[in-house]
């Protein structure tokens, strides 16, 4: 690759689009004649406010976000939102969660600190290899919201059809599939996403929340920074935000617009994932771990059936210039994360390497 870069299959932080990195490099020492790098700017300056405004406007255009939704750029990652969602949205102290993998499981554990959590469906029985049927969930009338992790980064499952919430608010953690395909924001009460997987550098989460869900009658013990009202009333500027992440993400939003938006990005992601899944389906050594109907386009876990051989594959791929293919420590195996910025050439090169590895080890 150009600049001696590697195909980085990390689950996050992950690859960013090369044209974006080049533009950031070119603006590093003197951003648009300001005489300083964005990392050096006051977040209260006019030049930085323009960066924030452009980033929000471009994201709104990309996702066609309705006017009655707020866009917030908040420090920290998705894990902080496990608590923030429950603390801000549990007006009646009750929420329904769907357990589909490691991240929804962690969100459930955190939400239980703030109210009653009903796990209405789970795929734990088959090691989170599918999405349970959520067409007729048992949802109490006084439920504040229904929560899903729309793409489970570790287990590699994704929702192809949203749950029937029976009129209740839907909250979705989209961290590992954010901006990977078109999204009808009106289907959700709230979307949030840690940006380090599919958008920019680590340390920030994007929150898209319907205005009527931003409450004033919140627990007075809640840290003021975790209040969505605090963030919304101050335009994500209650304190110094993650200025660098906002800037970098703004560049990615513009890049996505330039290539044809989320429809085009979705087509590319389908093509990329197909290269790897087609190989896994015919391989005698490597096997995918997710039922085909629920396979993620972003995170592709697979195994050889032998922990020792899995480790050998990881070592061999790293030596060949394909980084971060080791599966998450909680599940083992292997995992290829092919987020937006991964070119299809990366998927093709990985498959060719795995074919060669398989041939050499099955003689």
Spans of model-derived segments:
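Conserved PLP-binding catalytic core of the aspartate aminotransferase-like
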Residues: 286-317
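Conserved active-site segment immediately N-terminal to the catalytic lysine
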Residues: 171, 185-196, 205
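Active-site phosphate-binding strand-loop segment of PLP-dependent enzymes
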Residues: 12, 111, 123-178
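A glycine-/small-polar-enriched, mobile loop at the entrance of the PLP active site in fold-type I
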Residues: 5-56
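PLP-dependent enzyme catalytic core of the Aspartate aminotransferase-like
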Residues: 1, 6, 319, 332-363
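Conserved N-terminal alpha-helix of the aminotransferase class I/II PLP-enzyme fold
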Residues: 34-81, 88, 102, 110
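Active-site C-terminal subdomain of aminotransferase-like
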Residues: 195-277, 291, 360-363
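PLP-dependent aminotransferase-like
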Residues: 79-146
């Amino acid at each position: 690759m150009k600049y001696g870069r590697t195909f980085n299959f990390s689950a996050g932080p992950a690859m960013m689009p090369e044209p974006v990195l080049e533009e950031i490099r070119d603006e590093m020492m003197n951003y648009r004649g300001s005489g300083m790098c964005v990392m050096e700017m006051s977040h209260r300056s006019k030049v930085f406010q323009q960066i924030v405004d452009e980033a929000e406007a471009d994201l709104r255009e990309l996702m066609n976000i309705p006017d009655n939704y707020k866009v917030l750029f908040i420090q920290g990652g998705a894990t902080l939102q496990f608590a923030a969602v429950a603390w801000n949205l549990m007006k009646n102290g009750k929420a329904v969660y769907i357990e589909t993998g490691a991240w929804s499981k962690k969100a459930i554990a955190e939400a239980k600190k703030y109210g009653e959590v009903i796990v209405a469906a789970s795929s734990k029985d088959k090691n989170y290899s599918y999405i349970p049927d959520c067409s007729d969930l048992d949802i109490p009338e006084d439920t504040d919201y229904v929560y899903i992790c729309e793409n489970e980064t570790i287990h590699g499952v994704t929702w192809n059809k949203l749950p029937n919430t029976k009129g209740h608010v839907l909250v979705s953690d989209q961290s590992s599939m954010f901006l990977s395909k078109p999204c009808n924001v009106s289907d959700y009460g709230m979307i949030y996403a840690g940006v380090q997987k599919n958008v920019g550098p680590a340390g920030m989460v994007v929150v898209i929340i319907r205005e009527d869900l931003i409450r004033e009658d919140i627990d007075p013990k809640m840290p003021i920074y975790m209040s969505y009202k605090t963030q919304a009333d101050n335009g994500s500027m209650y304190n110094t935000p993650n200025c660098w992440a906002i800037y970098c993400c703004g560049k990615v939003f513009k890049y996505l617009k330039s290539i044809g938006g989320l429809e085009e990005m979705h087509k590319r992601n389908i093509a990329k994932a197909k290269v790897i899944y087609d190989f896994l389906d015919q391989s005698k050594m490597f096997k995918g771990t997710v039922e085909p109907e629920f396979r993620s386009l972003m995170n592709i876990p697979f195994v050889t059936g032998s922990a020792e051989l899995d480790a050998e594959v990881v070592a061999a791929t790293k030596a060949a210039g394909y980084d971060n293919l080791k599966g998450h420590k909680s599940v083992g195996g292997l995992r290829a994360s092919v987020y937006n910025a991964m070119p299809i050439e990366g998927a093709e090169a990985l498959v060719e390497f795995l074919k060669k590895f398989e041939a050499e080890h099955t003689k």
